[in-house]
Each structure stands twice: as C-alpha cells, then as structure tokens.
Amino acid sequence: MQVSVETTQGLERRLTISVPAEKVDVEVKNRLRQISKTQRINGFRPGKVPPSVVQKRFGKSVRQEVAGEIMQRNFVDAIVAEKINPAGRPSFVAKSNEDGKALEFEATFEIYPVVELKDLEKIAIERPEVDVTDADLDEMFVTLQKQHQTWKENKRKTKSGDKLTLDFTGRVDGEEFEGGKAEGFELELGAGRMIPGFEKEVTGMKAGDEATIKVTFPEDYHAENLKGKDAEFDIVIHKTEGPILPEIDEEFAKLFGIEEGGVEALRVEVSKNMARELTQAVKAKVKTQVIDGLLAGHEVDLPSALVTQEVDVLRQQAMQRFQGQMDPKNLPQLPAEMFTEQAERRVKIGLLLGEVIKVNELKVDETKVNELIASAASAYEDPKEVIEYYANNNELMQQMQNVALEEQAVELLVEKAKVSDKKASFNEIMNPEAK
C-alpha cells in the first residue's frame, strides 16, 4: 500500500492510497467463487456456473463492493501509520478501479485542530458566597403554599394575585386579529402572561365591569404583523376570585410526603433541597464563567464535520420537544442555521476541555461519579433504586463518567484562575432574571 498525504485547506486533508492489483483481484475472485457456489442461474446446475458467466453477470458490482471494503480497511491502516486523527467520516473517490490494475483512491476528511492552552491564570471568576437563610426558607414556604392555594369568589375590586374570568376582543387599526379573542379566559394578575399593560389596565375592575383598554404590543413580539402596534381590547369581567392559602400545619406537611415530624420535619427537608439546588446553581454559575473565559481566550479552528454532527443533535432534540406539544404533521422544518452558533460553541468547548483533560492527564474520579449519581438520585422518592438503575446501565454510567471528567477539568481551571468571592443572596443565584 502506497500513501501520500496532502493538505487541501484548513483542517482538510486528502490521502491518496494505492493498493496493489493482485490484492484486489484475489478478493474479487474469491467473492465471485462464493457466488458461483450459491447463485442460481437459468441453464446451469447449482455450483456448476462457468466462471466466465459469473464474471460477466456479477464482476462489475462485486469489484465495486470489494473496492469499497478495501478502501475502508486501507484508510484505517493509513491513518494509523501516518498518526492522523480524523474528525468525522471520510469521503472516498476511486481514481482507478479496473481488473489487473492497482486500486487507487482518495480519501478526503478533516482532522482535529491543534489546541494550545494559554493564559489560563487570566480567567477571572466571581464565586458567589451564599447560604440558605431562615428568610429564604420562609419565602419558599409561601411559594409552596401558593402551589396548593384554592380560590374563593369575591365582589371587590381586583388586585395582584387575584384570578379573573373574562372575555376579550382585540383590534389593531380597527380590525380584529388572529389570537386576539377569547371567552371565559382565566387570568391570574401578576403572572405576566399577557402583553405589557394588559394586566395593569384590568387590575381594579370587578365582576360585571365592561371596558375598552389600550395597550401596545412590544417591538420584539413574536407575530410580525403586531410588533410595536397600538391595540384596543374590549373587556368583559365575569368573575373575580381571591387566593386562599393553606395553613402551614401537619396536613400541609403531608402534602409533601412528610408523615412524621410535621412542619418542623418539612422545614428540614425543604432546607436540604434548597441547599442542594443552591450548591448546583453556584457550581453552574462558576462553570459558566470558566467556560466563557476559556472560550474568550482561545481561537480554535472547528472541524465542520463536528459542527454538522452537533447541529443534527440539537435539531433532533428540538424536534423531540415539539413532538410532545403538537401534531407530528404540523412539525416545522428547523433550518440548520438556527443551531449553528450553539453547535460551534459546544464543539469549541469540547475541544478545549478535551485538551485540558489530555494535558493534565486527568482520569475519571470514581468517587466523584458516585457523588454525582447520589446527588441525582436524592431528588427521587427511592434514591437506592435510582443508584442501582445507574449501576446496571452502561450508557448512563458512561455519561456520568464524562460529566465527572468535565467537572474535574473545570475544577482544575478554577484552581488556576483568578477567583474572587462575592456575597450574594439565595434569590440572586436561583432567580437571576428577577433581579
């Protein structure tokens, strides 16, 4: 086998490989011999078909089939010999594939880029310093109460937190528009479900009131024909209801699976969950800063094959989310461009973290793997069952090992980075958009 390597452009490489004619011809003849033993051809007894007949009928297709197999095998041998690390599958082109002649073909593919890590100590991180306070716990209990609140009809003027049942008809430029009309619509004031200004205009109304309100659609509204448009809505209020929060007592605790210990036991359990979620959120915030700093400090050529693969993964995930929400017949065709930027980011992160792992010779820490599994399992009713499920599923274990290795790489980068601790509150970390 003769091999030559050519750099075509960027990360693209082309191997030209020549395989001696005798090697190809021997495989073709052996394959044709097998066919002659099994193939039924009119006018000949099984196993008695003359080689010339087999060659005439099957020679061309068999040679193409054999050539494809030889190209695959010799490509693998060539990249091992040349110490080349391809990113993605190669494309093959046979330049010469005739009886009695050497099989010459080209394999075009991309390689992984050379990644050089630098200035890791310049990555700046603000690490949140935060605990779960009694006030945070009290606020969480109010949230839990609201999750189990009931409603009581009233006749007073509405305020934030109340629920309205209303009809509305919207118009833009005097014309009704699609999606602008509803009857018996339930609206919780303060939930932010409607366009800006709508809830404010109906707050203070009471059952039986009718009014026409004026609002403006935001410039970034999803419907192109309504962006920035002034609108009028005719409103009819049918019913108003105020929230009734449940008492925080033993019965309330039982709603969350606490059969013994009452409210105090519930506070302990909720506090544990909050602390676990807070730890994960802080870790995620630090990781985001590390990754952003790593990306900003490095330029990396990205193999288009890897980006394409990642686009396909992201698009498939998006389609799966849509499938649970709408009729498969109406599923949209999602263009690759929607996912390209995210795919490029993910590929770049993978290449950089892969280099961190390689340079520092990081190995999977099984203790960390077990901690990650235990943390994931703790959110379920029967953690032992979840842990056992992971232990018996090789694919899930591999995924968790990859997560652990990635976390080890991030932790190493944090050690090298400039880290400053900054005091923060539970809400700032858990609800950053509410700031």
UniProtKB/Swiss-Prot annotation:
GO annotation terms (biological process): 'de novo' cotranslational protein folding; cell division; chaperone-mediated protein folding; protein transport; protein unfolding
This protein's record includes keyword Cell cycle: yes
Record function comment: Involved in protein export. Acts as a chaperone by maintaining the newly synthesized protein in an open conformation. Functions as a peptidyl-prolyl cis-trans isomerase.
Enzyme Commission number, as recorded: 5.2.1.8
Sections of the chain in a coiled coil: none
Annotated gene: tig
Location of this chain's protein in the cell: Cytoplasm
Family annotation (InterPro entries): PPIase_dom_sf, PPIase_FKBP_dom, Trig_fac, Trigger_fac_C, Trigger_fac_C_sf, Trigger_fac_ribosome-bd_bac, Trigger_fac_ribosome-bd_sf, Trigger_fact/SurA_dom_sf
Chief localization: cytoplasm
Protein name: Trigger factor
Sequence similarity: Belongs to the FKBP-type PPIase family. Tig subfamily.
Record domain PPIase FKBP-type: where: 161-246
GO cellular component terms listed in the entry, alphabetical order: cytoplasm
Keywords associated with the record: Cell cycle, Cell division, Chaperone, Cytoplasm, Isomerase, Rotamase
PANTHER family associated with the record: TRIGGER FACTOR CHAPERONE AND PEPTIDYL-PROLYL CIS/TRANS ISOMERASE (PTHR30560), TRIGGER FACTOR-LIKE PROTEIN TIG, CHLOROPLASTIC (PTHR30560:SF3)
Domain comment as written in the entry: Consists of 3 domains; the N-terminus binds the ribosome, the middle domain has PPIase activity, while the C-terminus has intrinsic chaperone activity on its own.
GO molecular function, one term: protein folding chaperone
Top-level taxon in the UniProt lineage: Bacteria
Reactions it catalyzes: [protein]-peptidylproline (omega=180) = [protein]-peptidylproline (omega=0)
Pfam families reported for this sequence: FKBP_C, Trigger_C, Trigger_N
Keyword GTP-binding among UniProt keywords: no
